[in-house]
Amino acid sequence: MEQVPPSANRDGADAPTVVDAIDDRQNAITAAADALRAGGLVVLPTDTVYGLAADAFHQKGTARIFAAKQRSRSLPLPVLVRSPKQLLGLCTDLPPAAERLMAAYWPGPLTLVVPAQPAMQWDLGRTEGTIGVRMPLDDITLDVIRQVGPLAVTSANTSGSPAARTIDEAISQLGDSVDVYVDGGPREGGAASTVVDLTRGTATILRGGDLDEDDVAAVAEGELDPLEAAARWAERAAT
């Protein structure tokens, strides 16, 4: 484990820890999970870019994300889950389009915006009764979610800056506002996830990504079989 030199904005707190998940995977997962349970911030590798994570149900942690990123609360935090089943506990009225899209693209670079359970004790920003949810295609982050539960995760950068594709890029932007950095090597994705809003009756693509938008729309409308869409995506991702 390495440490990032401390700076004044942590008021004398211990320097952040950098853990190599390639050489010591279990130690990295344990360090990340311990920090998250305590309300800390952790930078994790995902299948797109590096993400800045907090326990979704720890309000101190999610508040720290907004501060670290200098992010407006009008931009609510998305949540990462370990499975479609875990999503069912976070939302209401999951439409058939969501089932089809999850079958095609989960785990993977697709975020679904769905109606949130009103009784959830969390603070993800101004959600207006919705939640953005994704299941990442990254074993390290999925293992952390299995230990901690759903995570509030956004790109590991300050607002308006490029997303971090390496742990050094994340450190250069977020510094000692983070408790643990988990180094999983360079991220190949580069692009953020495709975001589809399913709260308006019809599927609406809010943000494009690496997924083919025509295929995403066709799956949502039931015009393209999810397995065919998954095969097309796998072929495209391999090239």
Regions found by a protein language model. Name each.
Residues 1-239:
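Active-site-adjacent structural elements in enzyme catalytic cores
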